[in-house]
Amino acid sequence: MSAIVCLRASLAFALLFTSGYTAAQQRTLPPMKIEQLTPHVYRYGGLTNGAFVVGRDGIAVIDGQICGSNGTQWLKDELKKRFPGVPGKYTGRSHDHEMHICGLEVFSDTARAISHVNAKGHIIREKRRTVVPEITFDERMTIDLGGIEVVLFYLGPTHTDNLIQVHIPSEKVLIAVDFVREGKSLAMPELRDLNLDNSIRALGYLGRMEDVDIVVPGHGGITTQQSFIYVRDFLVALKERVLEQMVAGKGIEDILKTVTMDDFSDYGWFHQWIRANVITMWELMYHYREPTLDPGCYECDFPIGFPVGEVDKFNGP
């Protein structure tokens, strides 16, 4: 397969991944459930994880559910039954991706909507099916629920330019959506929207944070901080190996054969996602590096944007 075909294939994969969740709405979804993690923090959800924090003065709901699931309305009804007289005070969005924030408008009668400042523009432009946030922040924000503080913070562009982390220090819980999965696992199906180097730094920071015993990912079971280190180690190794092959003049077809990452094959989702991770890492590195033109021209051998079979080598300036 040529480089340009691989690029198109990876973009098609991204569309397939996104549309797959639309199709998921038409099949039987996992049942909604609530799990108490600490005295004040709960995980809820079905296909995706949300969370909520209960204080004396109100409840903060972090993330919605997949569109069409009616999951947030289900949660609102459950909260009324379990915590009568305690209003929803805030709704937080981990990032702008719709499958994690659908339905939060059901809390708009009492709750104020929060997101990172960068998320608001995406939500408006893409017409996300959620309430547009009225409160935005840049680096850090603390909300008080009455005896319980919830800290929302931004580590820079990582998975999207607006992904935030949510920390409840007194409960030693960190909500880290779409940045890790349970145990030792790949975190993402592919890396197309990843800011790679800052993600590596952020993963290291999250792996060392104090006052964290429980990590709530965006999908699957709860985990620990070690999962951040697993993901960081994989990304560091994948970047180094793909770059090494590119510097040696290898195209994506050869890289897919040589960069097998077999030493990470015990990671969850490895066999399903490794090919797309390699392809999208190559895409990131293609734009990251500036090849030395002499004795060859990597971009001449592996151009982007030209029809397959009609590319002539040239000696650029």
Regions found by a protein language model. Name each.
Residues 252-317:
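C-terminal regulatory/interaction regions
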Residues 33-77, 165-177:
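Conserved beta-strand hairpin/beta-sheet module of binuclear metal-dependent hydrolase folds
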Residues 22-26:
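Boundary at the C-terminal end of the N-terminal hydrophobic targeting segment
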